[in-house]
């Protein structure tokens, strides 16, 4: 794989399928059945054991780091229960490994039938010491790589003690067996990875086995399987509790409904009176609301009528005042006209009297004065009538 491809894979693992903003780049979703659920949980045996002596090859399902990143983001908001599928996958794989281990043990047991139980126990002791030394040496290498020199020195002291115990156990085992059978009985099966181990292998070889990728890969798979079992058991327990809680709630509701129906059937009068009281209270509340609405409407109507009557009275008063003013103006004009007319007539009469002093003229003047006085009275009567009409 080139450096560019490695960088692209790292970006997919960190940011998911839509790292470039293109959502159509990846048509398959992580929830698809074609996607390996063990790969999404980072525990697929095809990935863990790749490059070892038990390499399983390429997985039949889809493996994509971007899909794993999408699943990690989505699993924070929703539980997809992919742990169950991964647990089934790992269980089948570990069961196959345990089956191979049992077969290898049976093959070794067929060649070791003549060995007594005491000799077998001594051989078991030698093998246990070999495993202990190998694990301690692998730990020493790990501590040295981390730079923890003091801890690695302490572990090396334990390794030396285990080596001394191993030499003693080998001496006891060698003395308890004949020389011919001692050379034949030198193999043992590893309980973790089902690989063959020699009873007389040196420490370096044992350390390489226990610190190797195959053995550590099987340890990782077995630990992941135990973790998945625990997680699945917790989730199933939680789901069972929720289901039981919902069932109890349904049963409680059903009991409550049954109790209510029984109480209604036992006391129909009480239920009727209850219904009657409810209906009555509802009707009373409706009546109160209706009254309040009608009162508010009446208040609004009164207010409007008062305002309209006030406006009408004001307009009527204004019209009355205006009519009075107009009538007064008219009367003033008429009185001034009559005054001028009387003065004019008086001046004319004086002139005529001075000119005509005959009795005939006097009679005519008297008739004329009587006629003009009658006309003045009629005009006064008309002005008074017009004044009254204006006031009305």
Curated annotation (Swiss-Prot):
Source organism superkingdom: Eukaryota
Residue spans of biased composition, Basic residues class: 258-321
5-hydroxylysine: residues bearing it: 266, 269
Keyword list, A-Z: Coiled coil, Hydroxylation, Nucleus, Phosphoprotein
Keyword Phosphoprotein annotated: yes
Expressing tissues: All isoforms are expressed in brain, kidney, heart, thymus, stomach, skeletal muscle, testis and spinal cord.
Protein name (Swiss-Prot/TrEMBL): Putative RNA-binding protein Luc7-like 2
Source organism: Mus musculus
Organism ancestry: Eukaryota, Metazoa, Chordata, Craniata, Vertebrata
């Amino acid at each position: 794989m080139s450096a560019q491809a490695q960088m692209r894979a790292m970006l997919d693992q960190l940011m998911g399928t839509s790292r470039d903003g293109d959502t159509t780049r990846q048509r398959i979703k992580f929830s698809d059945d074609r996607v390996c659920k063990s790969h999404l949980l980072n525990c697929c045996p095809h990935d863990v054991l790749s490059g070892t002596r038990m390499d399983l090859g390429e997985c039949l399902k889809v493996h994509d780091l971007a899909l794993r990143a999408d699943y990690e983001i989505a699993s924070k908001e929703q539980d997809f229960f992919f742990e169950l599928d991964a647990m089934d996958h790992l269980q089948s794989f570990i069961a196959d490994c345990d089956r191979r281990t049992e077969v290898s043990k049976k093959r070794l047991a067929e060649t070791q039938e003549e060995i007594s139980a005491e000799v077998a126990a001594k051989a078991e002791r030698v093998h246990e010491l070999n495993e202990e030394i190998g694990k301690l040496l692998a730990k020493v290498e790990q501590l040295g790589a981390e730079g923890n020199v003091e801890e690695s020195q302490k572990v090396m002291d334990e390794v030396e003690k285990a080596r001394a115990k191993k030499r003693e156990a080998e001496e006891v085992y060698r003395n308890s067996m004949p020389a011919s059978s001692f050379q034949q009985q030198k193999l043992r099966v590893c309980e973790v990875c089902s690989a063959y181990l020699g009873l007389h292998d040196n420490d370096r070889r044992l350390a390489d086995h226990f610190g190797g990728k195959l053995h550590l890969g099987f340890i990782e798979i077995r630990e992941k399987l135990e973790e998945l079992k625990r997680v699945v058991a917790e989730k199933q327990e939680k789901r069972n509790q929720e289901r039981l809680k919902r069932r109890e709630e349904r049963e409680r509701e059903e009991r409550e409904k049954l109790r209510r129906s029984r109480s209604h059937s036992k006391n129909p009068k009480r239920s009727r009176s209850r219904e009657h009281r409810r209906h009555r209270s509802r009707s009373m509340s409706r009546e109160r609301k209706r009254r309040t609405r009608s009162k508010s409407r009446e208040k609004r109507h009164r207010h409007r009528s008062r305002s309209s009557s006030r406006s009408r009275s004001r307009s009527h008063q204004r019209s009355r005042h205006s009519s009075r003013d107009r009538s007064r103006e008219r009367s003033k004009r008429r009185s001034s006209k009559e005054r001028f007319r009387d003065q004019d007539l008086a001046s004319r009469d004086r002139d005529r009297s001075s000119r005509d002093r005959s009795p005939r003229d006097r009679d005519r003047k008297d008739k004329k004065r009587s006629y003009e006085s009658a006309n003045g009275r009629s005009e006064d009567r008309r002005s008074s009538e017009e004044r009254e009409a204006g006031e009305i």
